[in-house]
Amino acid sequence: QLLDKYLFAIDLEGGATFSAMLTNPFGCAIFTLLFLLICYLINKGEVSDGIEKFNKVGMPALFLMLVIVIIRAVTLPGAVEGLKFMFKPGYAVEAGFIEEAPSLLNVVATAGGQMFFSLSLAMGAMITYGSYLSKYENLKKNSVVIVVADTCMALMSGLAVIPAAVANGIANGVPYDQITLSGPKLLFVTLQDVFAAMGDIGPLFGIVFYLLVLIAAISSAISLIEVVVAFFVDRAALNQRPANRSRVVLWVCAAVTIESLLVAIDGLGASGVFTFWGTDNWNDNFLDFMDCWSEGIAMPLGAM
């Protein structure tokens, strides 16, 4: 009863659970704090003891779980329509997924935003991790490997999600233009329905997939926290006042926690706590506001 009241509605299924969570600021805040506690415990150690050890296990596990989910996703009835949506030019308009093709400028802007975010450009991550490399490392080779690996993982992620979402929509008689193919609802509503439709094996694939999402989220969070931590630690070293890494990580995580709690409490706008006026992309919820600020303004300016 306590879990039902304060964390989530345990008697609900699929998208209903997600909707219940969004309207429960306390539950969202608790899970946010637990996530950031994990990040703190990983970051507070030396890089080789914390982040490096996590990634040595987490990244191969992520790849393996992604392959498992892809195999199941592309073998679902109707998955071929999702593959056409991804890889056949013009098919999204032809089949009715969207009314008209986006403009070239829109495509370039969207691809550019994805590039900056996916490769952690203009946010200090590459500089920070690069500073930990040996001087004997081949930077040109590493750059090519990173870009190729990132592109492959992006395509694999699409193969794990889009065909399954389209197949689920077809199975439920949902018109193509009403199938959710992006955003949190795709991840936490549509895909839950997909796993539920798989029968007895569905929960297993669901567990594997959401563990995959968790590992990806943790690896991204600890890398960005490390950027800020490294800045303060290195600045203290330059001033010949060595900083206590654990203490720096604690203060950085405390600041991140405050901002993260604002997003969690807002519940993607479901709680009605925050309302923004301005452009259409800024007025839905606090997460969209921060996303527009970071990807639309801060990251491009930082890159320049």
Q: What do the predicted segments below correspond to?
A:
Residues 217-223, 248-267, 279-282, 288-304:
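Hydrophobic alpha-helical segments of multi-pass membrane transport proteins
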Residues 52, 56-222, 236-248:
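Membrane-embedded translocation segments of transport machinery
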Residues 227-243, 286, 304:
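Alpha-helical transmembrane segments
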Residues 3-44, 120-127, 207-211, 221-225, ...:
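Transmembrane alpha-helical segments of multi-pass small-molecule transport proteins
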Residues 160-165, 226-233, 269-278:
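Re-entrant/interfacial helical elements at transmembrane boundaries that shape
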Residues 1-48, 78-109, 184-188, 268-289:
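Inter-helical loop and helix-membrane interface segments of multi-pass membrane transporters/permeases
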Residues 1, 30-44, 60-73, 162, ...:
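Hydrophobic core segments of alpha-helical transmembrane domains in multi-pass membrane transport
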